[in-house]
Amino acid sequence: MANEYLFTSESVSEGHPDKVADQISDAILDAIFQQDPKARVAAETLCNTGLVVLAGEITTFANVDYIEVARQTIKRIGYDNADYGIDYKSCAVLVAYDKQSPDIAQGVDEGAGIDLDQGAGDQGLMFGYACDETPELMPAAIHYAHRIVERQSELRKDGRLPWLRPDAKSQVTLRYVDGRPVSIDTIVLSTQHAPEMQHKDIEEAVIESIIKPVVPAEWLKDTRFLVNPTGRFVIGGPQGDCGLTGRKIIVDTYGGAAPHGGGAFSGKDPSKVDRSAAYAGRYVAKNIVAAGLAERAQIQISYAIGVAKPTSVMVTTFGTGKISDEKIAQLVLEHFDLRPKGIVQMLDLLRPIYQKTAAYGHFGREEPEFSWERTDKAQALRAAAGL
């Protein structure tokens, strides 16, 4: 008897208040890295109606106009009118950055602390995941949820649907049979819109112009579409909800298809393993699947603050592995340097590449800056596995 179930993931657009905060935090990081690639940055952002607050810990010699970076990020997203709840020209921006604690710094700085190698910036556990449900080796539900809100942004910015506003959320429910996605049961898209628009016009445009162009037609035969199910979505963005950095960690990763260690990414330089080790985990898992060692691969990595080597590395392939999980884990340790310094070098992370990651997912995007999406280790892994 076939095993059937439904699985759901969501995404949000770049105009969602939490994503506005994430993008400001990563824009700050990039602006600093353009001058000082070895800076220590933990940039947090809060945005509300007409207000942006920048706080956190930054140690750098870079001279950055943080207020202007925040304003230009808000402008790029599309909040250029006070009627939208926040306007880059008139919003207040408060800056309250401190420097990194010297107690933390001595554990992270190479040559300082008990472990003379560059230690992890904190304790914690991180997960990486990949599967063969999409060409990008991502879970299908989060992949299509991202593509829907990405399409919403595209049609808003190029003027084809000029009544769209920046804030939007998508949700995709997939039907699985024996562990494989076969169709889409439900798609939800809530999109902010101009006040004069009628619901029926919004619904038709969303289904025909946003959803159908980015989702496989064969998966839409019996799909239920829920477009702005409250009936109206005019007040949105930071006016509708206060936005905070780091509140969309499942959207940022695998849409709930894999565990999450709890650490957010945006605004953090790669000495923070919350970010860099999660990127390394994706790199490892994607290469395992690309090598044909498994159909699904999940890796957990953990660290102690100030210590370079991971405290644990575990690989799970959910019964899909061509060799044992223990053997794959051994190959991972042989082919990937998972010390913080090794990750930074392996993935070339001391670059101003992070603002692009802060909307539409950190994983599963074939962007040239996203070094963790490379599959350049797959051939060596396959050979070492004897396949």
Curated annotation (Swiss-Prot):
Residues where ATP binds: H16, D167, A168, K169, R232, F233, D241, R247, K248, A264, K268
Positions annotated to bind K(+): E44
Subcellular location: Cytoplasm
Cofactor(s) of this protein: Mg(2+); K(+)
Binding site for Mg(2+): D18
Assigned keywords, A-Z: ATP-binding, Cytoplasm, Magnesium, Metal-binding, Nucleotide-binding, One-carbon metabolism, Potassium, Transferase
Keyword ATP-binding: yes
Any one Gene Ontology cellular component term annotated for this protein: cytoplasm
InterPro entries in alphabetical order: ADOMET_SYNTHASE_CS (IPR022631), S-AdoMet_synt_C (IPR022630), S-AdoMet_synt_central (IPR022629), S-AdoMet_synt_N (IPR022628), S-AdoMet_synthetase (IPR002133), S-AdoMet_synthetase_sfam (IPR022636)
Main location: cytoplasm
A single BP term in Gene Ontology: one-carbon metabolic process
Pathway: Amino-acid biosynthesis; S-adenosyl-L-methionine biosynthesis; S-adenosyl-L-methionine from L-methionine: step 1/1
Region (Flexible loop): 100-110
Entry's EC annotation: 2.5.1.6
Main function: Catalyzes the formation of S-adenosylmethionine (AdoMet) from methionine and ATP. The overall synthetic reaction is composed of two sequential steps, AdoMet formation and the subsequent tripolyphosphate hydrolysis which occurs prior to release of AdoMet from the enzyme.
Complexes and interactors: Homotetramer; dimer of dimers.
Xref: NCBIfam families: metK
Family: Belongs to the AdoMet synthase family.
Name of the protein described by the UniProt record: S-adenosylmethionine synthase
Gene giving rise to this polypeptide: metK
